[in-house]
């Protein structure tokens, strides 16, 4: 009886393995033929806005007297490029068969979409990218910049007269030598880096495990939250208030300042070197405290659980 029961099980297992092998071989053959093809789009109506949605391709903007879009693609990842209603639209589409998603040999080949256009000021820029990087040089400026990426990185040196809104999963966010009205940055495990950035209004940053690194940054107010990410400030000047809430991440500031500071962390340490004196209220359950006594300046409230607290004034 047991032998009779075992026979169908063996047959089913053989069929399952054989079927999987066939699908895997089909996907392998398909991947071997997945060559990269380059296409150019020159006959485009004038545009001042951008609506770009990509799957695996990197996106790069390049200064050029000639306006064109150069697309690298494979037979598995195709693109449509159009220009209508003053908007350049680039849409990537994954057309793999379902079994090719299961057996993924060499599918993520290096491909890129490059937008060539004259230097100058443009309207809104919207980008969605799954695994590709987004790179924007300083030759361009935009009225607004909105981007959502998964594993790709965002690297921009472009000024924005309006707001910058970036959402990333594991990708890194880097802005350097730019101005903007407001910044709202969210990342899961990716780091966030701002260098030589001047923001008229507020900067808001939120991550899970990613670190924040700000250098030579100015803004009206700053707010951030993180689980395990560290916060590092170097020459960061905030007109109004700095609000930081961390779980286990450290907070370190050098040559930085704000009218008021409110910092909370659990196991991370807090080490501040502020430009002007503050009235410091430091609270820690088991951590050590080394803070100066001052009766002038704005409030500086610091609360940790086990993290040490150190505060110094430059003046």
Show which residues each predicted segment covers:
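Acidic (Asp/Glu) and glycine-rich low-complexity loops/linkers
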Residues: 1-149, 153-168, 174-187, 193-206, ...
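Eukaryotic tandem repeat interaction scaffolds
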Residues: 203-260, 268
């Amino acid at each position: 009886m047991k032998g009779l029961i075992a026979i169908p099980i063996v047959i089913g297992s053989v069929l399952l393995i054989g079927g999987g092998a066939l699908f895997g071989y089909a996907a392998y053959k398909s991947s071997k033929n997945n060559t990269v093809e380059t296409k150019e789009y020159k006959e485009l109506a004038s545009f001042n806005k951008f609506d770009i949605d990509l799957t695996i391709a990197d996106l790069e903007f390049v200064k050029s007297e000639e306006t064109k879009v150069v697309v690298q693609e494979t037979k598995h990842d195709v693109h449509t490029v159009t220009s209508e209603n003053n908007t350049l639209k680039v849409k990537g589409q994954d057309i793999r068969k379902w079994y090719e998603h299961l057996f993924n040999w060499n599918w993520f080949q290096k491909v890129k979409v490059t937008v060539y256009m004259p230097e100058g000021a443009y309207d809104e820029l919207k980008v969605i990218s799954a695994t590709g990087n987004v790179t924007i040089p300083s030759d361009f400026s935009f009225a607004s910049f909105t981007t959502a990426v998964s594993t790709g990185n965002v690297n921009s040196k472009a000024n924005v007269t309006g707001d910058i809104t970036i959402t990333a999963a594991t990708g890194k966010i880097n802005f350097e030598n730019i101005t903007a009205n407001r910044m709202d940055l969210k990342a899961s495990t990716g780091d966030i880096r701002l260098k030589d950035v001047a923001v008229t209004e507020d900067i808001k940053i939120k991550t899970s495990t990613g670190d924040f690194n700000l250098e030579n940054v100015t803004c009206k107010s700053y707010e951030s939250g993180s689980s395990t990410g560290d916060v590092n400030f170097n020459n960061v000047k905030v007109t109004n208030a700095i609000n930081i809430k961390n779980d286990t991440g450290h907070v370190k500031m050098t040559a930085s300042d704000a009218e008021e500071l409110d910092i909370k962390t659990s196991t991370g340490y807090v080490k501040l070197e502020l430009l002007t004196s503050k009235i410091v209220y430091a609270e820690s359950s088991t951590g050590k405290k080394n803070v100066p006594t001052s009766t002038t300046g704005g409030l500086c409230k610091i609360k940790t659980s086990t993290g040490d607290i150190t505060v110094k004034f430059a003046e």
